[in-house]
Design a protein with these regions (language model features):
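Bacterial Sec-dependent N-terminal signal peptides
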Residues: 1-20
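Aromatic/acidic polysaccharide-binding cleft in carbohydrate-active enzymes
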Residues: 341-416, 433-437
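N-terminal catalytic cores of secreted or lumenal carbohydrate-active enzymes
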Residues: 29-245
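Carbohydrate-binding surface patches
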Residues: 434-470, 481
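Conserved, mostly hydrophobic/aromatic
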Residues: 63, 96, 153, 248, ...
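C-terminal beta-strand-rich structural cap/linker in extracellular carbohydrate-active enzymes
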Residues: 478-491
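Solvent-exposed loop/turn segments at secondary-structure junctions
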Residues: 66-71, 105-109, 159-163, 252-257, ...
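Active-site neighborhood of glycoside hydrolase catalytic domains
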Residues: 223-353
């Protein structure tokens, strides 16, 4: 396989010598405008984009299917709904999403809290059901599957059934948006951290500033085994709906101590549940389903290292899922644990601005993850209504924004930032070169041998970069605050 991939890259390099590249550019005031043809040069005339030592194969573009996203698209006329789904999920559409993330129980973009079994003490899971999922999540997925029959799926919980937690409630901490007894906040640690974190501005310090001292899951063998069985029941229930789940992660953002559905875990608890219960249970009952360690949203390398350095844990999981602050330690983790597969698991959603700044931010994040070895990329909500408000009172961005009063939708600047990558980098592409900073550039070779260069200038001055294309260079002049894709197969 490695020999065959080398032949593809060599043949692409030889063929690149005679190629010219056409381009398409997006700015804040003008989206998706065709640009000039650019020819290859023997010499670099700008900052040279770094060739990567290991050109990893890209897997899939994904999105999460949430109730509030389903509610948003349902506000549109049938024809507009069909157009949205086609543009997002069709193999010849604009985003070509071919992987879905499924929330197991409610997340923060559910209508409200629910789980598949809220009967206390039901260790045999006799009352387990996915009735709530049939209202929105499953119909949403079915519409995507109709356009992309080969779509794959992975699942993760935000919160276990409330009776499996030490606080017997879905949040981790009390808040005006939930009914949790504030006295239970002491279970986490004495005093709460500053709740005004601003992920959108790329955190400069350590997150979280203080670690939970307690597993919020009840660490009793009956509960641990019942929860592992719960994953299997969820996989089976979705399989009965012809929705195959081939990978799971134990918990969304164990380091976000949330007022919405969540669950804090210690490193010891993570290892115990995954290595002693979840992985062996699924290996026995669902041998085709892989377990990844995720989703990681902390930049505390020592914490994640303490989990993966456990020999049983490292040998049990097949990969690692990272989002938000977790992306900051991607390279270090790959260096120390090269046998694992790394994926990005959730797009950074901002605070409901739906603006050009969000587009530039997402463009840079895709460059960072793919250029540093993440092999899948999952977006969060691809569609939301109005200000993108959750059931717990906070606002987020989406790629498509619905006006509930008018029954219309807008494709946001962030949508086009994603399109600059997703339309041109299919599954099986190799990421061969990358630069970051204010001029993020990514060079990919598709399975057919086509070169794709996705570049941006996020700064206020003109920039000149040189992307390596085989033995030659594509010299690119980038105007300030532009997003551009160059391809020798661009129509």
């Amino acid at each position: 396989m490695k020999h065959a991939l080398s032949l593809i890259l060599v043949s692409a390099a030889l063929g690149a010598a005679a190629r010219s590249f056409t381009s398409v550019t997006t700015t804040e005031s003008a989206v998706w405008k065709p640009g000039a043809v650019v020819s290859l040069s023997n010499k670099a005339k700008g900052t040279v984009v770094e060739t990567l030592a290991d050109s990893l194969e890209f897997g899939r573009w994904g999105t999460c299917f949430n109730e509030r996203g389903y509610d948003a698209i349902s506000m549109l006329p049938d024809s507009a709904q069909a157009s949205v789904m086609r543009r997002v999920f069709s193999p010849d559409g604009e985003l070509r999403i071919n992987m879905g993330r499924i929330p197991m129980n409610a997340n923060d973009y559910a209508r409200d809290w629910y789980s598949c079994d809220e009967v206390p003490g039901d260790f045999a899971l006799e009352h387990f059901n996915i009735d709530r999922d049939r209202e929105a999540i499953i119909p949403f997925i079915k519409r995507a599957q109709a356009l992309c029959p080969g779509m794959t799926f992975w699942a993760s919980p935000w919160c276990p059934p409330s009776w499996m937690k030490i606080n017997a409630d879905y949040p981790v901490r009390s808040d005006r948006t939930n009914t949790m007894d504030p006295r239970k906040d002491a279970l986490l640690f004495a005093g709460m951290p500053d709740g005004n974190r601003d992920d959108y501005k790329a955190p400069k310090g350590i997150f979280p500033p203080r670690l939970s001292e307690t597993d919020y899951f009840i660490m009793d063998s009956r509960y641990l085994q019942a929860y592992a069985d719960y994953f299997g029941r969820f996989i089976d229930a979705y399989a009965a709906e012809q929705i195959p789940i081939d990978m799971v992660m134990y918990q969304n953002e164990a380091w976000s101590y949330t007022p919405y559905p969540g669950c804090a875990w210690t490193p010891e608890g993570i290892v115990r549940f995954n290595a002693e219960y979840l992985v062996p249970t699924l290996a026995r009952t669902h041998p085709g389903v892989e377990v990844y360690f995720g989703t990681i949203n902390t930049n505390r390398f020592d914490v994640i290292d303490s989990v993966l350095s456990d020999s049983l844990m490292s040998a049990s999981v097949k990969g690692v899922g990272l989002q938000w602050e977790g992306g900051q330690i991607l390279s270090r983790l790959r260096d120390k644990y090269p046998h694992l597969r790394y994926v990005q698991t959730e797009g950074e959603c901002g605070w409901g601005s739906f603006d050009w700044k969000a587009a530039e931010h997402t463009f840079e994040r895709i460059n960072h993850y793919l250029g540093n070895g993440a092999q899948d990329y999952t977006f969060w909500n691809f569609i939301l209504a109005d200000d993108g408000e959750s059931g717990w009172g906070w606002k987020q961005n989406a790629l498509i924004r619905v006006d509930s009063a008018k029954g219309t939708c807008t494709y946001t600047p962030e949508y086009y930032a994603v399109r600059h990558y997703a339309e041109f980098i299919p599954s099986g592409s190799r990421i061969v070169a990358r630069s970051g900073g204010d001029t993020p550039v990514l060079v990919a070779v598709t399975p057919s041998g086509t070169y794709v260069v996705v570049a941006a200038n996020l700064g206020d001055k003109k920039a000149v970069v040189s992307a390596p294309i085989g033995p030659k260079y594509l010299n690119i002049t980038l105007k300030p605050h532009t997003l551009t894709t160059f391809s020798d197969a661009l129509e």
